[in-house]
Regions:
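Generic structural signal for well-ordered alpha-helices
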Residues: 7-11, 45-49, 75, 138-142, ...
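C-terminal domain-boundary segment and adjacent tail
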Residues: 85, 135-207
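Metal-dependent polysaccharide deacetylase catalytic core of the NodB/CE4 family, i.e.
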Residues: 1-71, 101-103, 109-122, 151-153, ...
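Active-site-adjacent pocket scaffolds in enzyme catalytic domains
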Residues: 53-54, 58-148, 202-204
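Generic structural signal for helix capping and beta-alpha/helix-loop junctions
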Residues: 30, 70, 95, 193-195
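Anion (oxyanion) recognition and catalysis
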Residues: 14, 79, 178-179
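Alpha-helix N-cap and loop-to-helix initiation/capping positions
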Residues: 36-43, 125-129, 165, 169
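Conserved beta-strand edge residues that scaffold enzyme active sites
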Residues: 27, 67, 92, 191-192
């Protein structure tokens, strides 16, 4: 677990005020392994959240399962343990409420398409083509956002986007987005907090 093994990285993230989102106890210990053993899944999540609070100094508010492999029980466990955002699902460009047995939790959707690993490492796009893809995605969502807000989640991995030529291109994309009006750069916690204050109803139940 990086919280245990890479404290200097965690300290640097905290100093910069970046959001830290728990990503399971171990990358290869998928929650789906416990799909038929909810007690074990609950224990893994609880252990992860306890260590997070010990190291980070505050409770976690959002969760992204390793490999996006949550179970039907995951949202309810997260809500039970005090989280407000669950980020595994890929099915929308807007946040929405998941109604669990412990109350609602906000789904802040993730994206596998708009993700440096799938764009470059798997997709084989050139740096310029990849950034053009990001701009096209942003432009479409920006237009739709004139009617109702949209989320553009860009998944980045240091060993992929961290190549010098890609860093320069990423900087170009960020400046492109910053040049637009009415664009918000929130954390998942901020999105969920805002959405909980706005959403009128729950739309599905996870038990």
């Amino acid at each position: 677990m990086i919280l245990v093994e890479r404290r200097r990285i965690i300290d640097a993230v905290k100093e910069r005020g970046w959001e830290l989102v728990p990503h399971n106890w171990a990358q290869n210990d998928l929650l789906t392994y416990y799909a038929h053993d909810p007690d074990r899944e609950s224990a893994v999540i609880r252990r992860t959240l306890d260590k997070y609070q010990e190291v980070v100094g505050r409770p976690a508010k959002a969760w992204l399962s390793s490999a996006l492999r949550g179970t039907p029980y995951t949202p309810a466990f997260l809500k039970e343990f005090g989280l407000i955002a669950y980020c595994d699902y890929l099915n929308d460009d807007q946040p929405y409420l998941i109604d669990t047995v412990h109350g609602p939790i906000v789904c802040v959707p993730y994206s596998n398409d708009i993700n440096d690993f799938n764009i470059f490492a798997r997709g084989g796009l050139s740096t310029h083509d990849g950034i053009d893809m990001l701009k096209l995605c942003f432009d479409e969502l920006y237009g739709e956002g004139a009617v109702t807000g949209r989320i553009m989640n860009v998944g980045l991995h240091p060993h992929v986007i961290g190549q010098p030529h890609r860093i320069a291109a990423l900087r170009e994309f960020i400046e492109y987005v910053r040049g637009k009006t009415k664009v918000w750069f929130p954390t998942r916690e901020q999105i969920a907090t805002w959405y909980l204050a706005q959403a009128p109803q729950h739309i599905r139940r996870s038990t």
